[in-house]
């Protein structure tokens, strides 16, 4: 069980960069625990405020409800309290509660509640879903606002009154007006996380709206670059930010956007580039082609030597 209160967890994750480690798979697509342990230990050597086990980049959507707590257990065991570990949960309410309870027992410090699977619902239904998950555990919960689960400010306010352990709001839609209204309504009651794909692209404008942190997928394979970029965002170092976007992030996005599902596939490909092969993505996702792998390799090698050499250690 976590030793952190929901409020302590929220304060911690709001203080620095966040990331979602990939979930390594063997050739037969089974969980590769040894590689996962090695990756988690390595990532803990960098300045990161929280790691999300079995999150979106960790292919939560392809893990079974039984696998998620197991992945979380390994993450908690390997990090040894060096960094908070949060777990993904989602699908329908019953399954989301089941995964949440299992993750809490496995030692997770918090939860990221992903949208219900393919279900569109009214605000009252979404609120009841979030409340049911929050009340099934004692650890802190972060709600992921995206796709078919977009909570409006008034709904969030009611939920925060009813659920003291609802402590975070992750934005995955990029609606500036909605984000402004949410922050104006809730203020410091919640910790705000930028959660758009390749969140570095939106990090600076979001900072001015109270979003002090974001989830960096590229931290998986170029952690030195990711942490330096985050530091530049916090300092509002426009020159460093725009150089990082131009030289690495935007070319990476160009490869990612070629095919559906590459937001995850390209991160696993990056792990392979730096010598930390974490296996294939699970179906229905597909891996990068040889040509795309070559392009990604060249992009990573073009980074400053310090970022590449430290990433490959």
From Swiss-Prot:
GO terms (BP aspect): D-glucarate catabolic process
Domain of life: Bacteria
Involved pathway(s): Carbohydrate acid metabolism; D-glucarate degradation; 2,5-dioxopentanoate from D-glucarate: step 2/2
Family statement drawn from the similarity comment of this UniProt entry: Belongs to the DapA family.
PANTHER family (UniProt xref): 5-DEHYDRO-4-DEOXYGLUCARATE DEHYDRATASE 2-RELATED (PTHR12128:SF19), DIHYDRODIPICOLINATE SYNTHASE (PTHR12128)
HAMAP family the UniProt entry points to: KDGDH
Protein name from the UniProt record: Probable 5-dehydro-4-deoxyglucarate dehydratase
Organism: Bradyrhizobium sp. (strain BTAi1 / ATCC BAA-1182)
């Amino acid at each position: 069980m976590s030793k952190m209160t929901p409020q302590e967890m929220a304060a911690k994750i709001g203080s620095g960069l966040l990331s979602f480690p990939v979930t390594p798979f063997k050739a037969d697509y089974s969980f590769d625990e040894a590689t996962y342990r090695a990756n988690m230990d390595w990532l803990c050597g960098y300045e990161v405020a929280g790691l999300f086990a079995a999150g979106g980049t960790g292919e939560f959507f392809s893990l079974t409800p039984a696998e998620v707590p197991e992945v979380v257990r390994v993450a908690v065991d390997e990090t040894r309290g060096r960094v908070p570990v949060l777990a993904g949960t989602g699908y329908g309410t019953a399954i989301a509660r089941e995964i949440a309870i299992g993750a809490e027992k496995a030692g997770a410090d918090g939860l990221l509640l992903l949208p219900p699977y393919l279900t569109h619902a009214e605000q009252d239904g979404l609120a009841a879903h979030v409340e049911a998950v929050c009340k099934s555990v004692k650890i802190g919960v972060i709600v992921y606002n995206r796709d078919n689960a977009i909570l409006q400010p008034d709904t969030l306010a009611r939920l925060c009154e009813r659920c003291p352990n609802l402590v975070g709001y992750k934005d995955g839609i990029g609606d500036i007006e909605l984000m402004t209204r949410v922050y104006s309504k809730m203020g410091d009651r919640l910790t705000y996380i930028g959660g758009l794909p390749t969140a570095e692209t939106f990090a600076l404008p979001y900072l001015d709206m109270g979003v002090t942190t974001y989830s960096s997928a590229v931290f998986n394979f170029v952690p030195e670059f990711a942490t330096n970029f985050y530091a530049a965002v916090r300092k509002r170092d426009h020159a460093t930010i725009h150089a990082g976007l131009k030289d690495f992030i935007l070319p990476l996005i160009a490869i990612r956007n070629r095919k559906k599902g590459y937001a995850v596939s390209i991160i696993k490909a990056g792990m392979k580039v730096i010598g930390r092969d974490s296996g294939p993505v699970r179906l229905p996702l597909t891996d990068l082609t040889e040509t795309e792998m070559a392009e990604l390799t060249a992009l990573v090698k073009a980074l400053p030597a310090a970022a590449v050499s430290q990433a490959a250690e």
